[in-house]
Amino acid sequence: AYKTGLIDKEKCSLEFVGFGTMNGKDGKPFKTRDGGVMRLEYLLGSVSDAIYKKVESNGGNLTEAEMRDIADKVGLAAIKYGDLSNQPYKDYIFDIDRFTAFEGNTGPYIMYSMVRIKSILTRFQAAYPDAKLGTILPPESKKETDLALALCRFNEAVEEAYTQNAPNRLCHYIYDLANCLNQFYGEHNIMKESDAAKQASYVTLIRLVLRVLETSIHLLGF
């Protein structure tokens, strides 16, 4: 890059970061069923098809095009997150069932958590069209405290991922944040909260969680 003039040494420095290999369940480099080299196009298609089957079984009133669009987007997130959530220099096992699961430390789980927030915000806006953003009140429960503290660790997680050339640090952070969110939601029914100030605080809190998750997946490239 220096020799071709693409990079100016005085303005930018390059650093080599080694990456491990994606292996099959047998611990050997991942291959197709016929033993050939696994092409990215084939991998993307396989994961997208796996996600599609799951979406189809719970698709409700979604059209074929909508289900396929969701499968493609979530499938790409599954692969990128699955790859980046591992330590860069280590080999890892590609398990399509684990990578495409909507539970656990996976891309689909992160996407699901974001969709859950958007659904709550949409319902809240429909029920309270004139509502304004509230002040985030001091937390009163452990789950609320855990979520607030997790949000406070965002800058630290980004800095660690950058300085250590380790995107897995950011992946682990958003997984922890998503867990805190879902545990908080399981304990606090936002739509049925009778205290308007608390309800506004909860909505502002999860809106901030969504913003952090969206920023994080943008930084991770999906």
What label would you give each PLM region?
Residues A1-F222:
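Non-catalytic interaction-recognition regions
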